[in-house]
């Protein structure tokens, strides 16, 4: 009898030990899960804090870039002014640059007066690497895209060509609203292949003529139909002693004729050429970069001026990596 009770007691003790062991395992699992939850929550908190910090830095960089725009847009602030680049405590800074929107060829203006000005585009495309006949064909296609009629220019492309490609609403028969539209024109891919940076040569926002005080030698050469060496010499004189464009020692031409004389344009030809160039464009392009910590934000603004009053006609923003 005593042996039976002893055996039963031993059995009960074994069951209790088993239950305690199971409970311990369960507790360890719970502790592990809680530890994992705490770790995950901590990680999420760090991510959220980092995200908040980045958002704050982005916002600060945007404010700094906007400050640069506001200063550069003032009519009394000129290129090279020290106010255009400023640094602050903590490493924050902004840097703004002013340029003329007329330092690029106005594509719509050239096509509007295509009878006299198409030579500018033909010569530019030829210099970029197209054959003469290819350059002529591309310009024909550009003219047909913007003119109001459906008559083909030489061997250009009008509605029937695009219709056969199931592009039923092409061409638009109006001036370009965006440089992206130029990519829709027949054979323009040849220009893109020859010069992937072709956009840097064109604008749709200027007053029309090329700003001879700020345009690069390549564009002055094709617009004025002069030798590239003459255009390079003009740019060298224009850039002053430091040979750096956009600084305070730059020489500005106040008269188009003086610039054309320097380029060696014959008097009988100067009247036609003078319609393509100017000494100042009413639109200014302002590029401002704001920096806060490791974050940089770039604002690009084009301002159209009438006297001392400016109107923003283009605005773009991007975060720089």
Segments the model singles out, each with a brief description of its role:
Residues 2-8, 12-16, 20-321:
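Compositionally biased linear targeting/interaction segments
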């Amino acid at each position: 009898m005593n042996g039976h009770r002893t055996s039963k007691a031993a059995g009960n003790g074994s069951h209790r030990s088993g239950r305690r062991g199971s409970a311990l395992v369960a507790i360890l699992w719970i502790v592990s899960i809680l530890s994992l939850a705490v770790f995950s929550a901590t990680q999420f908190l760090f991510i959220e804090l980092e995200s908040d910090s980045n958002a704050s830095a982005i916002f600060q960089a945007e404010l700094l870039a906007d400050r640069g725009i506001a200063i550069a847009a003032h009519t009394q602030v000129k290129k090279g002014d020290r106010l255009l680049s400023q640094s602050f405590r903590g490493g924050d800074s902004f840097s703004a640059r002013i340029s003329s929107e007329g330092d690029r060829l106005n594509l719509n203006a050239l096509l509007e007066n295509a009878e006299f000005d198409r030579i500018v585009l033909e010569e530019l495309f030829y210099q970029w690497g197209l054959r003469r006949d290819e350059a002529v064909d591309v310009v024909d296609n550009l003219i047909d895209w913007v003119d109001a009629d459906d008559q083909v220019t030489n061997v250009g492309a009008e509605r029937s060509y695009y219709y056969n490609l199931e592009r039923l609403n092409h061409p638009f028969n109006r001036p370009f609203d965006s440089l992206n539209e130029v990519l829709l024109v027949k054979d323009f891919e040849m220009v893109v292949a020859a010069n992937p940076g072709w956009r840097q040569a064109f604008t749709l926002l200027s007053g029309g003529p090329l700003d001879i005080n700020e345009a690069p030698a390549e564009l002055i050469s094709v617009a004025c139909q002069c030798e590239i060496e003459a255009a390079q010499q003009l740019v060298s004189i224009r850039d002053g002693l430091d040979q750096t464009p956009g600084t305070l020692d730059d020489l500005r031409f106040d008269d188009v004729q003086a610039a054309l004389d320097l380029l060696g344009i014959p008097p009988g030809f100067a009247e036609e050429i003078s319609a393509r160039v100017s000494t100042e464009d009413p639109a200014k392009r302002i590029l401002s970069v704001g920096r806060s910590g490791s974050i940089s934000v770039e604002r690009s603004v084009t301002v159209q001026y009438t006297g001392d009053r400016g109107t923003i006609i283009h605005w773009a923003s991007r975060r720089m990596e």
